[in-house]
A protein has these predicted regions:
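Core nucleotide-handling region used for phosphoryl-transfer chemistry
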Residues: 2-417
Length: 417
């Protein structure tokens, strides 16, 4: 193990020598800014450390630290750079870009398996799925020859003992049908990104090459390509284009590793477009609000048709509320039959913004407020305001004035599903 192409990291060892007590180390890192600390729910004396933008050290992207021994336990893959790799430089690997979620696992001297995402030790957080990342990971693990968390623990503990290390860790990229990002996944799966160990001084060794891993991990290596040195940008783009044609639009791109922890990620144009449509929202309602405001709902549903029923439900609710906002606006600002303060709270932001829009944009042109103006205003509202509006009780118009200005809600709203 670790005979060649390993990353030897003494940065944590040096930090520990400078700051033998964890609280001093913590104060130092916080003085540099950009570090967030995430306590473990079930493991005493363990914190996850996440690097912010102001801390200029890629190794601190996500580190799990034992506060009692003042030692690192596990380090996630360093943050990848976007774009082309250095030219004329021998890469350690040219691999497929595998889209999924990163989850890390380690075994320390307690011989207990622990897992962590970047945000939560134990993997108890969620995103797209109602299941936790820890639960999704267990299902992905079951699809491999490791089978169970106990099987993973045995492999890591054997590695720890073999290397006389205080901890042994592995980073996976997991793919699960319930956590779709771009490509649709039909069954759970795992790939190993790197494997590492930590000594009792904090010295760390990380290997990105499957030839250095325990056999159970080597079976989970990410598919790679023989070309590992590029002499021109065109060579890189040619490989990307050829492979994209061969593998189809669901193929996502390439990752280039230099063997020292740095990675470069080059995505296909199709992947980039679909990733932008998918966005960073965990909840489908928040995603719908963004897409609707940008008139991209139909583009999105061409690829993510599984959200069709939910999106249509949101659209129908918003259309109904557009009619309610229009009616409330007439009652307050046209018929003066209702005081603004007496409107339901959920309607007030939209009615207020609609009046401002009329005052600043429409009045000087002699235009009346129409339902398309309501739609425009609603799209510009904050997401929590839209959600509160959608959940509000129906509004009954008090006055009968200017009812003729209210066309069919369905016909007037341009963003259809």
């Amino acid at each position: 193990m670790y005979k060649q192409m390993s990353i030897r990291v003494n940065h944590f060892e040096s930090l520990r020598q400078r700051f033998p007590v964890f609280e001093d180390l913590r104060a130092h890192l916080e003085s540099e800014g950009g570090v967030s600390w995430i306590p473990s729910d079930d493991t005493k004396g363990v914190l996850a450390m996440s690097r912010g933008k102001s801390l200029n050290n890629e190794m601190f992207r996500s580190v799990v630290w034992n506060t009692e021994t003042n030692l690192p336990l596990c380090v996630a893959p360093f943050k990848a750079k976007e774009g082309l790799p250095p030219l004329g430089t021998q890469m350690s690997a040219t691999e497929n870009f595998v889209d999924g979620f990163i989850i890390n696992a380690w075994v320390g001297s307690d011989e207990v398996l622990h897992v962590a995402t970047r945000k939560k030790i134990g993997g108890t957080n969620k995103f797209y799925s109602e299941k936790t990342f820890g639960d999704l990971f267990a299902e992905c693990l079951a699809s491999t020859q490791l089978k169970t968390l106990d099987g993973l623990k045995d492999v890591l503990n054997a590695l720890r003992i073999e290397q006389s290390a205080t901890s042994a860790f592995v980073s996976f990229v997991a793919q699960h049908p319930e956590h779709r990002i771009v490509a649709r996944t039909t069954s759970p799966g795992l790939n190993v990104v790197h494997v590492g160990t930590v000594t009792d001084t904090g010295y760390m060794t990380i290997s990105e090459r499957s030839t250095n891993w325990p056999q159970a991990f080597a079976r989970l290596q990410i598919p790679s390509y023989p070309t590992r040195i590029f002499h021109s940008d065109q060579e890189v783009h040619d490989l990307l284009r050829r492979t994209s044609v061969e593998k189809g639009w669901r193929w996502q791109g390439l990752v280039f590793k230099d063997g020292h922890g740095s990675r470069w990620r080059l995505r296909t144009p199709t992947y980039t477009m679909m990733r932008e449509l998918r966005g960073a929202e965990a909840l489908p309602m928040d995603r719908f609000f963004r897409l609707r405001a940008n008139h991209q709902v139909m583009d999105y549903l061409k690829h993510y048709w599984e959200d069709r029923d939910a999106f249509w439900g949101y659209e129908h609710a918003l259309r109904n509320k557009a009619a309610d906002v229009f009616s409330a606006y007439i009652d307050v600002h046209k018929a003066h039959a209702v005081a603004f303060k007496d409107l339901p709270d959920a309607l007030k932001p939209a009615v207020f913004m609609l009046h401002v829009h009329w005052r600043d944009q429409l009045r000087t042109k002699g235009f009346k407020v129409r339902l398309q103006n309501v739609n425009q205003v609603m799209n510009s509202m904050r997401n929590f305001e839209k959600q509160r509006l959608m959940e509000a009780a129906p509004y009954t118009q008090v006055s009968k004035r200017e009812v003729g200005d209210l066309p069919s809600p369905i016909a007037e709203i341009p963003e259809t599903v």
